[in-house]
Amino acid sequence: MSEKINQIVEELKTLTLLEASELVAAIEETFGVDASASTGGGVVMAVAPAAAEEVEEKTEFTVMLDEVPADKKIAVLKVVRTLTGLGLKEAKELVESTPKMVQEGLGKDAAEDAKKQIEDAGGKVSLT
């Protein structure tokens, strides 16, 4: 924008509601336009709800085991076995080959609970 436009915008920001209303009336009279017939505001209102609808809360989560410190492998292994029902060998392979998916298709609460259990045991977890 030009400097002149920027100055006008800054000046408009300082107007009270009454002054802004008077300004609109003066512009309507001077230029022979009707601000109430403007469709610009309607378009903005129509777009805003559509954008809000696109932001849906995720309902299914995948628990990813990102990293396990060497001194925490046994504790994390026990938690992974409890969460997944895997055997000792399978759970050990999962823990030693991070990053790996631990569980998928979980609800938010279940995923948060699994994440907390693994983190409490010393593992680093992410939810996707």
From Swiss-Prot:
Q: Which GO terms describe its biological process?
A: translation
- Gene3D superfamilies from the entry? 3.30.1390.10, Single helix bin
Q: Where is this region: Disordered?
A: 103-128
Q: Quote the cellular component terms of the Gene Ontology held in the record.
A: chloroplast; cytosolic large ribosomal subunit
Q: What keywords are annotated for this sequence in UniProt?
A: Chloroplast, Plastid, Ribonucleoprotein, Ribosomal protein
> What is the annotated role of this protein in its UniProt record?
Forms part of the ribosomal stalk which helps the ribosome interact with GTP-bound translation factors. Is thus essential for accurate translation.
Q: What is this protein called?
A: Large ribosomal subunit protein bL12c
Native organism is Thalassiosira pseudonana
